[in-house]
Amino acid sequence: MKAVIILGLVLLSVTVQGKIFERCELARTLKRLGLDGYRGISLANWVCLAKWESDYNTQATNYNPGDQSTDYGIFQINSHYWCNNGKTPGAVNACRISCNALLQDNIADAVTCAKRVVRDPQGIRAWVAWRNHCQNRDVSQYVQGCGV
């Protein structure tokens, strides 16, 4: 019985953690989902963005007390503008998606929403982490050795 409880706790901790992509695994997945060159944004820039926003973690969340919004998933997509979490005051939900969908191990919905984000005038500059860590830098290291 004790072993069953311990196994249950281990499985629960794995479930809560979500998927943490390896760098090259993410690069291949993003390429397959059509992000390489989308709106002129290189695959390396997308991988750099994911590194600095979530450390490649699909379950990453970050609460923003200023506007009571939360950032979700591998790209840290914000509930004030892009998704619906049922809690953020004045939310727009421009991606027309539940924020929980952005926390799935299958990142297809997150990629679709990220494509919507970059169609806005700010483009990829909407992400502070991209501006701080990727913009005007050599980001080729993020796809180096990945065969993409």
Curated annotation (Swiss-Prot):
Monomer. InterPro entries: Glyco_hydro_22 (IPR001916), Glyco_hydro_22_CS (IPR019799), Glyco_hydro_22_lys (IPR000974), Lysozyme-like_dom_sf (IPR023346). It is an enzyme of class 3 (hydrolase). It comes from Allenopithecus nigroviridis. The keyword Kinase does not apply. Pfam families: Lys. This is Lysozyme C. Disulfide bonds join 24-146, 48-134, 83-99, 95-113. Lysozymes have primarily a bacteriolytic function; those in tissues and body fluids are associated with the monocyte-macrophage system and enhance the activity of immunoagents. Residues 1-18 form the signal peptide.
